Amino acid sequence: MAATAAASVAAISPLPGASLPRPVSARVPLLPRASPPTWRLSVGSARARSTRCLAAAGGGGLAPEMRATLDKVVGSHKVVLFMKGTKDFPQCGFSHTVVQILRSLDVPFETLDVLANEALRQGLKEYSSWPTFPQLYIDGEFFGGCDITVDAYKSGELQETLEKAMLS
């Protein structure tokens, strides 16, 4: 057995004058760490006070063409869900959950697949100051992501908001 161990060590030992390759961590320089996002709570409804937080706007800014496009999409439908996949074939559990909630409330809604367009996906993150998907818009305003939608559904706030939107 000792001979086997010696043979395996010899098999991985470098040739005389050669050195073992450096580990990847020694070859790849570390990227500078980005500062963590700053979160601020918005005030307003009970939903906003208890669960909704918005990322503080970072630098860069949204291209005017993208802002105009998103304004048009969000403003032209009472309920819009930006999601991963489609309402008939959601590509993530969070998107599926919000679709199921909206269907259970028998609300007409439009969906846009953010996986089909990288520029749309990145633009929406800036537009809403919300980093994840799905993103639900009701009556032209950002309502929230999956967790906020679920909480609002359980409390009855989502139903109230949707009823008001459908009547306006």
UniProtKB/Swiss-Prot annotation:
It is found in: Plastid, Chloroplast. It holds the Pfam family Glutaredoxin. GO terms for molecular function: 2 iron, 2 sulfur cluster binding; metal ion binding. The keyword Chloroplast applies. Glutathione binds at residues 84, 121, 133, 146-147. CDD domains: GRX_PICOT_like. [2Fe-2S] cluster binds at residue 92. Its main location: plastid. InterPro entries: Glutaredoxin, GRX_PICOT-like, Monothiol_GRX-rel, Thioredoxin-like_sf. Gene3D superfamilies: Glutaredoxin (3.40.30.10). Residues 67-168 form the Glutaredoxin domain. One of its GO terms (cellular component) is chloroplast. Keywords: 2Fe-2S, Chloroplast, Iron, Iron-sulfur, Metal-binding, Plastid, Redox-active center, Transit peptide. May only reduce GSH-thiol disulfides, but not protein disulfides. Belongs to the glutaredoxin family. CGFS subfamily. This is Monothiol glutaredoxin-S7, chloroplastic. The gene is GRXS7.
